[in-house]
Amino acid sequence: MNGTTQNNAALFDGGVFSPYLTSRLPYWAGVRQNVVGSTVDGRPVAPANSSTLTYATIGPSPLDTAAAAAASAAASTARSMAADFSFYNHLASNAVTRTAVREDILTVMLAKLETLTAQLEELSQKVEELADATTHTPAQPVTQ
């Protein structure tokens, strides 16, 4: 980050490392939607630095200074997150936990299916035995 002061205002030049800023804007926002990337005002950005957007203040007002400071903080945070994977560890551990829970649920469902299959086979055998018993018995004459 570079900063200078002029007329009681701080001016910052900084970068925010995020393709999210241009790739997620709708077409009507005036930002070119292309694979190369684009700056906020629509100018193309070379692939080597397509994820870098430069922010600079427009005039010496407190609002511009606050915007530049926010952009600088965002850039610093983005660089920290890119360099330090501890920000993402809880996401990875949650994903592992969800996967383990899904595997446990699938194991329980598989066991229930195996039990149902065994019960169905047993029921099929009983039905077959009853069918054989009723078809092989000689017919009894009906007397009145």
Swiss-Prot record:
Main location: virion
A GO CC term assigned to this protein in UniProt: host cell nucleus
Claim: Coiled coil is one of the keywords in the record: yes
Highest taxon of source: Viruses
UniProt keyword terms in alphabetical order: Capsid decoration protein, Capsid protein, Coiled coil, Host nucleus, Host-virus interaction, Virion, Virus entry into host cell
Location of the protein in the cell: Virion; Host nucleus
GO biological process: symbiont entry into host cell
Alphabetized GO MF terms: hexon binding
Gene3D superfamilies (alphabetical): 6.10.250.3040
Annotated coiled-coil segments of the chain: 106-133
Induction of expression: Expressed in the intermediate phase of the viral replicative cycle.
HAMAP family named among the record's database cross-references: ADV_CAP9
Summary of subunit composition and partner proteins: Homotrimer. Interacts with hexon protein; this interaction tethers the hexons together. Self-interacts with adjacent proteins. Interacts with kinesin light chain KLC1; this interaction leads to capsid disruption at the nuclear pore complex during virus entry into host cell.
Chain's role: Structural component of the virion that acts as a cement protein on the capsid exterior and forms triskelion structures consisting of three molecules that stabilize three hexon trimers at the center of each icosahedral facet and fixes the peripentonal hexons. Dispensable for assembly. During virus entry, recruits the anterograde motor kinesin-1 to the capsid docked at the nuclear pore complex thereby subjecting the docked capsid to a pulling force.
Domain notes: Three N-terminal domains of hexon-interlacing protein form triskelions between hexon capsomers.
Note: This protein is only encoded by mastadenoviruses, and may therefore play a role in mammals tropism.
Family to which the UniProt record says this protein belongs: Belongs to the adenoviridae hexon-interlacing protein family.
Protein name: Hexon-interlacing protein
Source organism (scientific name): Human adenovirus A serotype 12 (HAdV-12)
Gene name, Swiss-Prot/TrEMBL: IX
